[in-house]
Amino acid sequence: MKFIKRKTKLLTITIGAVAVSSILLGGIFYGTSQKSPSSFGIASIDQKENFINKDNLDYQKARPSIKDNNLKEIPKPKPQPKPEPQPTPFPDPIPTPPKKEELKKPEIKPEEPKKPEIKPEPIPKPKPQPIPQPTPPVETKPKEELLPPSPPPPKEEPKPEPDPQPQPQQIPNQSTVRKIELNGVLVDAEVEVPPPRQTFKYDQDNGLSNLNPYTNISVGKIKKVFVTDELRHKSADLVRGNLKRGDYQSLVKDLLDPNIKPEEIDSYIAMVDKSGYHAKLWSKFKKLFDTDNVVNFLNEQGKKEYPNMKTKFVSDAHKYAWLYAHLDFSKFTKLSANSEKYLQEGLTPDPDNSYVNENGELDSYAYSPAKEYNTVTSRLANDNANRRVFGYNEWYNRSPNGLANGDYPGWNKSDATAEFKQYGIKDGDGIKVYKLERQKPQEGKLNTGYIVDIDADNPDGYQKTKELIQKLNNQNKKITGYRIRNMGKSDSGQKFSDILKALPNELPLLELFFSAGSHNTSALSALETKHIKELGLYTLGNSLLDEWSINPNALRKVEWINSNDYNVSSEYKQGSDIATRITFDTLSFDKNDFNDNANDLRTKLKRINDGLRMVYWTRNNEPFFQGGFGPGLDPDHKEVGNSYPQGLDFSRVPQIRSLRGLIFKDEQKASNNRERKLRRVNFFNDKENYEMSINDLNEAGFSEHIVTNEPMPPKSKITFSNGNATKRIYIKGNGSLTASGIQNLATLFNLAESLDSKSVVVDSNNSELKSQLEGLGYKVSDASDANYIDI
C-alpha cells in the first residue's frame, strides 16, 4: 500500500511539473511571438455602441466585437488642408471679430467727415457730377470686400443702367462701409452711393433741362446693416416704452373703474371714443391677448388670477383691458424675426405703430429709415435750405397761416412800405413792401430781402401793379420777390399776362395766390422768358381739382416750383381757407405752341412735344412734375416709375383734334420703356359737331394712349371746351377708317359722355365711309343735311 501511494504521489508531481513547464513555455512563446490578428481581447460591455461608418479604418489591429471599438483611421496627408477654406464664411449680418476689423478699415476715417457732407449740400448746384465726389478711389476697396456676402445687389443694379444709349455717362452705383446712426446707436452699414443723373444733349439744346439741375434723392441707400445687440436692445426699449404710454394706461384704468360694470365696457367705449383710440390700443396686443401664451407675460398677480378670470370675461374689450392692466412689460425684450430683417435693411420699428405678436415679440406695422437716410425728409430739408429763397434748415413745410401771411421760419418780417412811397404806393391801394431778415445770418446765403405784396382784388392796386414793377425795374431797385394774392377773386377773367411780362427777367421769388373759384392759369405763359429761382403757385381753395392745369413751357427757366408747402388734410375744418400749394395733374397748351407755318406734323407739334417731354421725362424727378401720386423708388434714374400729370387740355389749341403726332414715350432713354397714358383729355370745340379729319381719327391714339378697361374708378374721359354742347362726331374727307381708326372712334364714343349714342356725320360724297360706319352700327348722317350744318 505504501508503494502504491508513493507511486501515485510521484506520478502526480510529474504530471504537474509537465503541465507547469508547458504553460511557462507557451507563455514565453506567446510573449515573444507577433500578435495574431485573430486574437481575442476583453471589451467593456458598459460602453455605448460605436459603429464607425468610414471606409478608411485600420483593421490590422481589430478585435472581434459587435462594436467598432479601438479602430483607428488610416492616416492620410490630404485631409489636413480641408479646414483651410473655412475662413470664407461671411453670411451673418453681424461680423465675427476678425471680420469686423477688416470692415472697419475702409470706413476708418474717410467716412467720419460724413456729417459736414450731409448730402443736401451737393444738390443746389450739382451740375452733372455732384454725388460721387470725395471718395471714388476709397470706395472701390470696400466694394470688393463686401460683394462676397451679397453678390446680387451690386450685379443686378447696373443691368438696367446700360440700356440708355449715352456712352459711359451712366456710372454703376458704388457701395462703401460707413458708420450710421439708428435709434441713437452707431453701427456699421454698407451704403450705396447713387451715380449722377443721366442728362441728354437734346434736352439741353432745347431748353428742357433745369438750369440748376435737381436731385430728388441726395442721400445714399442703405444696403445692409451689421446689427449689434446694442441696437436690438435700444430698438426694443423704444417700442416697449410706447406700448406702456401713460395715455394707454389711463384708457385702461377708466375701463376697469369699479363704477363701470364689465358688460357696460363696450357701450362706454362707443359713447366716449369716436376716433377709435381703444381699437388702436387693442390692435397692439390682440395677437398675444388671443392666445394662452399671454400668461407668460403677466405679472405675478395676473398669473394667479388669470385661470379664474378666463371664464369671467364678457367681451373682448373687458378681456383686453384686464390683460393690459396685468402685463409685466419688462418681459417684452425680444424683437420679432420681421423686425430683425428690417433692422438689417436699415429700418427701425416705428414705436407709434408697434405691436406685440403671438409669441410676445416686438414688431411694428411701419418702419422708419435712419434720419440721415430718409429720402423724403432729406429732400424736403434740402429744398427748404437750398431751393427756397428765404430758406431754413428744417424738413417741415410752412403752415397755412405762415403761407398766407408771407412768414418764414427763422426769419423776421417788418413793414418797409414807407421806404417805397416814392414809387407811387399809397395807403389803401392793397400794396405793401415787407423786409425779411434772417434771425441767424449765414455766410454765402441771402440774409436780407424785400417782398412786394399785392392784393389783386383791390382795383387801385391791380391797376398800378404793372407801373410799379416797371418803376422798380427802371431804377434798379433790388426786389427779392413779388407776392400777388386773390388772383381772379372778383373777376375770373382778370388779366395778369401784362403784369407778369413786366417782371424782371431775373427774379429770385414769385408767389401767386389763385382764388378758389378761378382756375385760369393761362397768364403764366408770360413767365417763359423769366429766370426764376423759386415759383410758388398757391390757392386757399381746393388744390386737388382736375381743372388746375399749367403750360409746362412757362416753366422752362424756373429752377424750383415749390411743392413742399402742401397743407391738405382732413383735420382742417371743412370750408375754411387753407393756404396750400396747387397740385397740377393736367398739362395745358396755348395756340402759339402749335406751329401753323411748319410743313410737317412733327415740326408743327415740336413745342408741345417738348413740353410733354420736359414733364414726362426730363424733369420728372422733380416733385412738381409728378402729378398727384409722387415719385417711384428711384426718381432720379428710373423716371418710368414716377407718377406724372394724367390730363391734357387743348382747349386753347383749336388746331389739335386728337392725340395724333403726340409723343408719350422717352425717345432718349431706352430703359424708360413704358409710355405715359392719360385719363383725361379736353379738346377745343364751339359747335355741336366735333370735326376731325380721317387721318386725325385713324392716328388719334385714343385706344393706345388713354387708360381704358380698368375696373378701378375714376373712368377716363374725353371732354370738349363747350361742355355738353358737343353731340356728334363729324369725320371730314374722303376714304375709310383703318382698324385703328375704328377702334379710336369706339373709344371716343365710350369716353366722351356728351356725345349722342353712335351719331356720326360724314361728307355727302364719302359713300364708302358711310357704308363702313353703318355696317359697324353707327347712325350716319349726311353733312349736307340742314339739321347737321353748324353755323
Curated annotation (Swiss-Prot):
Q: Where in the cell is it found?
A: Membrane
Transmembrane intervals: 10-30
Membrane topology qualifier:
Single-pass membrane protein
| Top-level taxon of the source organism | Bacteria
Residue ranges annotated as compositionally biased, kind Basic and acidic residues, are 56-76, 98-124
Keywords for this protein = Membrane, Transmembrane, Transmembrane helix
Record's InterPro entries?
Mycoplas_M_dom, Predic_Ig_block
UniProt keyword annotation of Transmembrane helix present:
yes
- Biased-composition ranges, Pro residues, are 77-97, 125-139
Entry's Gene Ontology cellular component terms: membrane
Give the start-end ranges of region Disordered.
56-175
- Major subcellular location class: membrane
Sequence similarity: To U.parvum UU044.
Name under which the protein is recorded: Uncharacterized protein UU046
Lineage, uppermost ranks: Bacteria, Bacillati, Mycoplasmatota, Mycoplasmoidales, Mycoplasmoidaceae
